[in-house]
Amino acid sequence: MSRLVLAIGNSRWHWGIFSRDQAPQFWDAIAPHQPFSRSDLATFLQAQDPAIVADTPIAIASVVPQQLALLPEDWPQRRLQLRDVPLTNCYPQLGLDRAIALYEAGCQAGWPVLMIDCGTAITINAGDAEGQFAGGAILPGVTLQLRSLAQGTAALPSVEISAEGDRWGMDNQSAIASGVIYGIAGALRGFIEDWRSHHPQRPIYFTGGDGELLAKLLTDLPDIRVEPHLLLHGIDRLAQAMMTDPD
């Protein structure tokens, strides 16, 4: 039987289908503007995989709690919370997505590990040798920085970035792209080098929509791993563990 997972982010819903018989499937969708009915949700899911049956339980992690109301109440759901993540030393306001993705990185690579999630906000998340949350940082993501320049200035244009360009921009668009991309990469390099001074030769995971783009600017650093769907893998891992050990 297929297993459905959903990560509700700030701007998109990230879906995954896991099963024993085939490789996982992943897709993203813009957050819906109105609630799903049961039939609408079934149609939406079966468009991705006709083998999905109605009422297949969905394991969910959300950083936007109010969007949970967009799912039909009578569709089976397992809504994960921070207390469900076996990661100790978490502060109460730690984002659920950060905790799950860091835990999954530790499960895949062992501890200590560093996980960098490059989404709307970029979060840097450290786990120590005992599998505890060891601190981190939050900074505006690529799109958020681009939007702030376009909205907060009179003369600078709106810019979209799909690939890294020349560091030395020859017009406003390329200068903005360079400043944002290389500025973020420089900040991440500083955190990585500091962490590696304490944990040499330990892996660093990049995930999130801009994870691959930013990781490409740091390929001189050893053992950089890009796992776009780290959070969805973590949700599935936790949901399966909760099914086998409901207490």
UniProtKB/Swiss-Prot annotation:
InterPro entries: ATPase_NBD (IPR043129), Type_III_PanK (IPR004619)
Molecular function GO labels: ATP binding; metal ion binding; pantothenate kinase activity
Keyword line: ATP-binding, Coenzyme A biosynthesis, Cytoplasm, Kinase, Metal-binding, Nucleotide-binding, Potassium, Transferase
Domain of life of the organism encoding this protein: Bacteria
GO BP field: coenzyme A biosynthetic process
UniProt cofactor(s): NH4(+); K(+)
EC number(s) on file: 2.7.1.33
Coiled-coil spans in chain: none
Function of the molecule: Catalyzes the phosphorylation of pantothenate (Pan), the first step in CoA biosynthesis.
Protein name: Type III pantothenate kinase
